Amino acid sequence: MDLPVNLTSFSLSTPSSLEPNRSLDTEVLRPSRPFLSAFRVLVLTLLGFLAAATFTWNLLVLATILKVRTFHRVPHNLVASMAISDVLVAVLVMPLSLVHELSGRRWQLGRRLCQLWIACDVLCCTASIWNVTAIALDRYWSITRHLEYTLRTRKRVSNVMILLTWALSTVISLAPLLFGWGETYSEPSEECQVSREPSYTVFSTVGAFYLPLCVVLFVYWKIYRAAKFRMGSRKTNSVSPVPEAVEVKNATQHPQMVFTVRHATVTFQTEGDTWREQKEQRAALMVGILIGVFVLCWFPFFVTELISPLCSWDVPAIWKSIFLWLGYSNSFFNPLIYTAFNRSYSSAFKVFFSKQQ
């Protein structure tokens, strides 16, 4: 019983020369506040601008779809669903993640808000990823099956994809809360993160990323093959020049009639076909860039998210932040990519702003 008393009196009467040791012990028990260097302030400011730009751009796309009557049909309902998920990322996820970064990745806002933030994070990001997948599937079917993929079928299929997107995202995000599938908040260490339960890690990463990744890669491979096949079939629809004169005799009806063919070019391509091919090429390029940016943004995060709990690999905090915000940035790039390859949005933006003035 004397040992704690002596330690207490020693700690209270510690001379100033031993002050660094006492402060070191205090830091072990309770981490100090993060030092806001100029570089850190700059990074946090840029992240704040990213959140604001993501919200503004997606809200503009969503408002345009709601205001312009011609956009009240497919595939713009898929774009609206994607814009909603990305707006929610900017409103519900990014601000609290920015607070988390500002406090040195320590969560000081309580268990309830931590659970709500993680659920919104998984819900909105998963929905954004599956909305990209739905747009890629819609483009694939419209390019490769444009005869049977009618407007009525397209509308029904797109509505089903939107419903499945949000249903699957809800199940993945609420599974830890509803079924006690791991813990998201640790009060002693002030940690707030997605459940590290290995079974949930496999379930969530496969459902939120690896499955849609396989779908979009398969879709783009099929689009590439379809485009390559169309180029090949277009070449076979023409007759090349004949190097030498060829005599063709019709011996059955007119024995004395001779045709001389020196050059013949037959094409089956109309102006409508050319317009359709140009539209399909733009759509294929848009889907390719959309998929490429999606993979670049989310692949590092989900690789570490899967390997870290399964292999007990402690990823440095700085890399966790980089990979997480790189994934968030996909919500900023999505509307930029889609509207850049759709001329109707450019004219719709002009009409929208002209009416506001």
UniProtKB/Swiss-Prot annotation:
Chain ranges sitting on the Cytoplasmic side read 64-76, 138-155, 221-287, 340-357
**Where mainly found?**
membrane
Classification via PROSITE patterns: G_PROTEIN_RECEP_F1_1, G_PROTEIN_RECEP_F1_2
InterPro entries in the record: 5HT5A_rcpt (IPR001397), 5HT_rcpt (IPR002231), GPCR_Rhodpsn (IPR000276), GPCR_Rhodpsn_7TM (IPR017452)
Any one GO CC term of this protein is: plasma membrane
Q: Name the residues that bind serotonin.
A: 121
Q: What GO molecular function annotation could you give as one example from this UniProt entry?
A: Gi/o-coupled serotonin receptor activity
Extracellular compartment: which residues? Answer: 1-36, 104-114, 177-198, 313-314
What kind of membrane protein is this, topologically? Multi-pass membrane protein
Q: Which SUPFAM superfamilies match?
A: Family A G protein-coupled receptor-like (SSF81321)
Spell out where the chain crosses the membrane.
Answer: 37-63, 77-103, 115-137, 156-176, 199-220, 288-312, 315-339
Matches recorded under Gene3D superfamilies: Rhodopsin 7-helix transmembrane proteins (1.20.1070.10)
Task: Give expression by tissue.
Answer: Expressed predominantly in the central nervous system; in the cerebral cortex, hippocampus, habenula, olfactory bulb and granular layer of the cerebellum.
Q: Would the keyword Cell division be found if you checked this record's keyword annotation?
A: no
The protein's location, in the record's own words, is: Cell membrane
- S-S bonds: 114-192
Q: Which UniProt keywords apply?
A: Cell membrane, Disulfide bond, G-protein coupled receptor, Glycoprotein, Membrane, Receptor, Transducer, Transmembrane, Transmembrane helix
Any GO BP annotation: response to estradiol
Residues bearing attached sugar chains per UniProt: 6, 21
Membrane as UniProt keyword: yes
Sequence similarity:
Belongs to the G-protein coupled receptor 1 family.
Function of the protein? G-protein coupled receptor for 5-hydroxytryptamine (serotonin), a biogenic hormone that functions as a neurotransmitter, a hormone and a mitogen. Also functions as a receptor for ergot alkaloid derivatives and other psychoactive substances. Ligand binding causes a conformation change that triggers signaling via guanine nucleotide-binding proteins (G proteins) and modulates the activity of downstream effectors.
Name of the molecule in the record: 5-hydroxytryptamine receptor 5A
Which organism does this sequence originate in? Mus musculus (Mouse)
